[in-house]
Amino acid sequence: MTAATDPAQEAQWKRWRSVADLYHAYFTGLILTVVTRRGTADAAEFVFRVFRRQQQERFLPGLEKLGLSHLPPAVAAAQYHYLSNWIGGVHVEYMYESDRKALIRYPPPRWIWKGTAICGLPGEVSRAMLRGWHANNGVALRDLRLGFVCTKQSVDGQDGLEGYYCEYDHPPELDQRPVFAR
C-alpha cells in the first residue's frame, strides 16, 4: 500500500461507514415507528424475527470464519458476540468463567438503540432481540443445554445489556431460553 492510495481507501471507508450509519438509523427508526403505530407486541415480534433470521444466517458461518467452532458452546457463543460485534464497531466486553459459563456485556451507550432512541423502546422489544438471537445459539450448536441469562438491560434503566451463556445440566424449557434475572 502506498501513501497515494491511503487517502482513497480512507475516503472509501468513510463512504461505507456513512451507508452503515444510514441503514442503522433507518432500522432504529423503523422499530420506533412500529412501537408507536402498531404497539409493543408487534414491535417485539418484528425484532424477534429480524434477529432470529440473522442468527440463522450468520451464527454458524461466523463461528467458522472466526475460528471458534472448536470451543465449548458457552464460550463459542460469547466469543462470537464479542468478536463479531467488535468487528462491526460495537463495543462489547467478554469474560471467560469456565467452559460452561461465559459472560458478555454491551456497555452504554448501546449501539443498537443509539442516542435518545433508547428512551422510546419498551423492554419487551430489547428482550425480543435476545430471544431471537442469543436464546437460539444452543439450538444452532445442537446443544440444547446452552441457555442465555440476561442480568441487565439499558432499556430498563440499567447500565448496559449484560448476561452470560450457561451450559445447564439438562436442557432448559423453551421459555427459559433466555432467562431474564435481575
Predicted regions and their residues:
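N-terminal accessory segment detector
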Residues: 1-103, 110-129, 136-182
